[in-house]
Design a protein with these regions (language model features):
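A short, proline-enriched helix->beta-strand linker immediately N-terminal to the Walker B motif
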Residues: 181-185
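Conserved ABC ATPase signature
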Residues: 162-166, 170
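A short, surface-exposed alpha-helical micro-motif characterized by mixed small hydrophobic
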Residues: 228-230
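Catalytic Walker B motif of ABC-type/P-loop ATPase nucleotide-binding domains
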Residues: 187-190
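Helix N-cap at the start of a conserved alpha-helix in ABC-type nucleotide-binding domains
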Residues: 198-200
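Helix-to-loop junction immediately C-terminal to a conserved catalytic motif
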Residues: 50
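H-loop/switch region of ABC-family ATPase nucleotide-binding domains
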Residues: 222-223
Length: 249
């Protein structure tokens, strides 16, 4: 059974039909590359998979569970938060906080998640002392995981640096670490090699292949064909909101 199954996703924005019945599946630990020219609908697709937006029609099934069905009631805020954790997104612009260190950029999303867990813990009539201890335990786990990720991504010596002190490739790795710390089931990249020179593109290829060895399931949006075929297990080509080609690599 496929790990991810996307069925008949449609999306209209204004008077424009952006996605016109997109369907595909993906096995666990594999890399899917969505290839297409600018305006083909690639970024709209990834936003709908990550629930930054919602399909007008279609279903999304992940790890044997339907996580979105356009026929169902709208997702509650709690359900939406849970969905965001399932599919991590590495933005094209990285979206790092300039006033936070590398370590803080990685831990911030998990810290917000930890505070939500403490709220739930509090509702079980736990004392303030118990709440404090629980939060401290969660924080230690988060810090340990952040340091582990930074080490795996070759950033252990950059933990106290700020984004402006990093190269573009290093900023991208920080963005990846920030997504991975929430333990997503799928990691999505939006144009990870856009405007990079060949040397940096080679670094991205190496990094994605390393993540694949760790059994991460990934979806990559790109318009660069050479890059696509260096990392993909499966490629789908989108044109004007439709899949015009699909093949294993």
């Amino acid at each position: 059974m496929s790990y991810l199954k996307v069925t008949n996703i449609k999306k209209t924005i204004g008077n424009n039909n952006i996605l016109k019945g997109i369907s595909f599946d993906l096995d666990k630990g594999k890399v899917l590359v969505v290839l297409g020219k600018s305006g083909a609908g690639k970024t709209t697709l990834i936003r709908n998979l990550n629930f930054l937006d919602f399909p007008d029609q279609g279903t999304i099934e992940l790890d044997g569970k339907i996580i979105y069905n356009s026929s169902d009631q709208p997702l509650s805020n709690k359900e939406l938060q849970e969905r965001h954790k399932l599919i991590g997104l590495v933005f094209q612009s990285f979206n790092l906080f300039p006033h936070l260190t590398v370590f803080q950029n990685v831990t911030i999303a998990k810290d917000l998640d930890n505070k939500e867990k403490v709220k739930i813990f509090k509702e079980k009539n736990k004392s303030k002392v118990e709440q404090k201890k629980y939060y401290e335990e969660l924080t230690k786990e988060t810090n340990d995981e952040a340091l582990k990720l930074l080490n795996e991504l070759g950033l252990s010596d950059k933990a106290n640096s700020y984004p402006f002190q990093l190269s573009g490739g290093e900023q991208q790795r920080v963005s990846i670490a920030r997504a991975l710390i929430l333990n997503p089931k799928i990691l999505c990249f939006d144009e990870p090699t856009s405007a990079l020179d060949p040397a940096l593109t080679g670094e991205v290829v190496k990094l994605i292949n390393e993540l694949k060895k760790q059994n991460h399931t990934m979806i990559i949006i790109t318009h660069e064909m050479d890059f696509a075929y260096q990392v993909a297990d499966k490629v789908i080509v989108i044109e004007k909101g439709k899949i015009i080609e699909e093949k294993d690599n």
